[in-house]
Amino acid sequence: MSDVAKRVKEIIAEQLGVDEAQAVSEASFMDDLGADSLDTVELVMALEEEFDIEIPDEDAEKIQTVQDAIDYITEHT
């Protein structure tokens, strides 16, 4: 697992209050990890802060799974 993937999974687990083992690549924030729309906004903000990037709203809406987040961060850092 890459350093980015590990850090993303740690942030997801912390922000959504789930076990890191649940943050598998294909897990959907809303369907599998129980996030609501506010949780996903806070998650995006935490990712922006951790990786020092800005995620535009139109991109944030496309980040729906753990792998989506990992891919986005990898492409934009």
UniProtKB/Swiss-Prot annotation:
Pathway: Lipid metabolism; fatty acid biosynthesis. 4'-phosphopantetheine is transferred from CoA to a specific serine of apo-ACP by AcpS. This modification is essential for activity because fatty acids are bound in thioester linkage to the sulfhydryl of the prosthetic group. GO terms for molecular function: acyl binding; acyl carrier activity; phosphopantetheine binding. The modification O-(pantetheine 4'-phosphoryl)serine is found at residue 37. GO terms for cellular component: cytosol; membrane. Residues 2-77 form the Carrier domain. The keyword Lipid biosynthesis applies. SMART domains: PKS_PP. Transmembrane segments: none annotated. The keyword Plastid does not apply. Keywords: Cytoplasm, Fatty acid biosynthesis, Fatty acid metabolism, Lipid biosynthesis, Lipid metabolism, Phosphopantetheine, Phosphoprotein. It is found in: Cytoplasm. Its main location: cytoplasm. One of its GO terms (biological process) is lipid A biosynthetic process. It holds the Pfam family PP-binding. Belongs to the acyl carrier protein (ACP) family. PANTHER family: ACYL CARRIER PROTEIN, CARRIER DOMAIN-CONTAINING PROTEIN. NCBIfam families: acyl_carrier, PRK00982.1-2, PRK00982.1-3, PRK00982.1-4, PRK00982.1-5. Carrier of the growing fatty acid chain in fatty acid biosynthesis. This is Acyl carrier protein. It comes from Trichlorobacter lovleyi (strain ATCC BAA-1151 / DSM 17278 / SZ) (Geobacter lovleyi). The lineage of its organism: Bacteria, Pseudomonadati, Thermodesulfobacteriota, Desulfuromonadia, Geobacterales.
